[in-house]
Amino acid sequence: MWFKNLQIYRLPAPWAVSAEQLAADLAPHAFQPCSSLEMQSQGWVSPRENGELVYSLNKQMLLLLGTEKKLLPTTVINQVTKIKAAEIEEQQGFKPGRKQMKEIKEEVTDDLLPRAFSVWRQTWVWIDPVNGWMVVDAGSPAKADEVIKLLVKSVDKLPLETLHVAQSPVTAMTEWLVADTAPHGFTVDQDTELRATGEGKATVRYVRHTLEADDVRRHIASGKQCTRLAMTWADKISFVLTESLTIKRVTPLDVIKENADSTAQNDEERFDSDIMLMTGELSRMLADLVAALGGEVEKK
């Protein structure tokens, strides 16, 4: 198992917390299924089948946020509300007013909710207390914010901060393309996005296309900046760096897969092997990426 997206946060290095202590903090906010009148429920679930809320291996920790959401489209609510309102109008002899329509809609929603289908999703969290990383496997900041909100609620005085680097990803990626060179330990791949800073936000995208230095420089000279760049770290992991310092499309390459523990006898052992490999490599990759962006700086 590998994370696909990395929303990156900072913790003190080292962060002195045990898996047992963290699990105790999470327990009051463990996942509970939606009640008959709830649209959504969120809480911590066990990353493995042993029931523990914190998976811990080699001083690395995994958490898992579970979300249940009822599927009750607004169009369905409105249709049933319209039918119900027509029945009431016939009974009372006049159209329901705004307040009464609101009450009808609430009653319809309460009536439909217990029969609504549910969808479930899970969001993984990796905590590296040794090196001070916390990473959420989420494709958007909004999904990561759900994790952070509940984690802050669960852990008193959580020392979590946003990662701040000396050079913005946009500035750094643009400079790498202009110089036609990648930072130490990285290579530039064939996907990139160049976007103008003006009102029109004109955008050029290269997808699996060789980046011709002269063409790219012309776009940059015309006022565009690099907002997404596909890269590979140490010939081991490919990814896309974005303007917001989010890492997307994380993919372990063949050399990583070859190093996977082939002696694993079952799913549990394979999971342990994957997590040890992933956390070790990603921790080193994040450190190298921060260095490539001029190093970490304190928030002013």
Curated annotation (Swiss-Prot):
GO molecular function: double-stranded DNA binding
Keyword GTP-binding: no
InterPro entries: RdgC
Subcellular location: Cytoplasm, Nucleoid
Pfam assignment, any one: RdgC
Residues that span the membrane, as ranges: none
Keyword tags: Cytoplasm, DNA recombination
GO BP annotation list: DNA recombination; regulation of DNA recombination
Main location: cytoplasm
Single GO cellular component term: bacterial nucleoid
Family: Belongs to the RdgC family.
Function: May be involved in recombination.
Protein name listed in UniProt: Recombination-associated protein RdgC
Species this protein is from: Janthinobacterium sp. (strain Marseille)
Lineage of producing organism: Bacteria, Pseudomonadati, Pseudomonadota, Betaproteobacteria, Burkholderiales
